[in-house]
């Protein structure tokens, strides 16, 4: 009876050989895995833990000498300061330098501009006019005196037809009676002229007439 059902199952297709089942089971095992090449295992990309960048440390700089910087700003180099100095017009000497005195003995009025130029260069001038005619000498004195007044200079007579003219930067003083006075403080002596008295009077004449 069992053989009949077995044949019927084989005929219909329900009955499969046991070997086939066994092979199928084996294929489901290790042999099944051998049919396809094994794929290499792909490692998941792991994000490398990069260390956070450390903040850059400030550079150690040598301390700046502030006093030196201040002194350099306040006191520029000597060459630079000398190049930036603008001299006064007509001034050839620095303040505090040795004063220069020029002695001139002109022979004509045409030489007077040289005296004015020397005063503009802040030089003192001793003017000796003894070599000039009296009228020319008086004209020369008036001319130089006017120019000296315009530059705030000083003038003084120091001898017969000899005059001293100085710029405003020169202080001239003289000693009289043991006391020192500036030339501009010495009062000018006033000369009063009057006719000389006659050696004889009218009284003797009256007596002679008698």
Curated annotation (Swiss-Prot):
GO CC aspect terms: cytoplasm
Subcellular location: Cytoplasm
Lineage top rank: taxon: Bacteria
BP-aspect Gene Ontology terms: division septum assembly; FtsZ-dependent cytokinesis
Skewed-composition ranges (Polar residues): 64-78
Disordered, as annotated region: 13-78
Annotated Basic and acidic residues bias: 47-60
Keywords for this protein: Cell cycle, Cell division, Cytoplasm, Septation
Entry-linked Pfam families: SepF
InterPro entries: Cell_div_SepF, Cell_div_SepF/SepF-rel, SepF-like_sf
Acidic residues bias spans: 22-31
Assembly: Homodimer. Interacts with FtsZ.
Its job: Cell division protein that is part of the divisome complex and is recruited early to the Z-ring. Probably stimulates Z-ring formation, perhaps through the cross-linking of FtsZ protofilaments. Its function overlaps with FtsA.
Entry's family note: Belongs to the SepF family.
The protein, known as: Cell division protein SepF
Organism: Cyanothece sp. (strain PCC 7425 / ATCC 29141)
């Amino acid at each position: 009876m069992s053989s009949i059902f077995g044949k019927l199952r084989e005929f219909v297709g329900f009955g499969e050989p046991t070997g086939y089942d066994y092979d199928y089971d084996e294929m489901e095992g290790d042999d099944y895995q051998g049919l396809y090449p094994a794929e290499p295992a792909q490692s998941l990309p792991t994000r490398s833990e990069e260390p956070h960048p450390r903040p850059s440390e400030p550079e150690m700089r040598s301390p700046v000498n502030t006093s030196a910087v201040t002194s350099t700003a306040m006191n520029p180099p000597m060459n630079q300061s000398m190049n930036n100095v603008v001299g006064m017009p007509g001034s050839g000497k620095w303040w505090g330098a040795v004063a220069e005195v020029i002695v001139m003995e002109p022979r004509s009025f045409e030489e007077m501009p040289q005296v004015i130029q020397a005063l503009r260069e802040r030089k003192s001038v001793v003017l000796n006019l003894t070599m000039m005619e009296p009228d020319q000498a008086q004209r020369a004195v008036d001319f130089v005196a006017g120019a000296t007044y315009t530059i705030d200079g000083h003038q003084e007579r120091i001898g017969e037809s000899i005059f001293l003219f100085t710029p405003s930067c020169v202080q001239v003083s003289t000693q009289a009676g043991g006391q020192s006075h500036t030339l501009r403080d010495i009062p000018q002596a006033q000369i009063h002229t009057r006719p000389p008295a006659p050696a004889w009077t009218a009284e003797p004449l009256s007596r002679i007439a008698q």
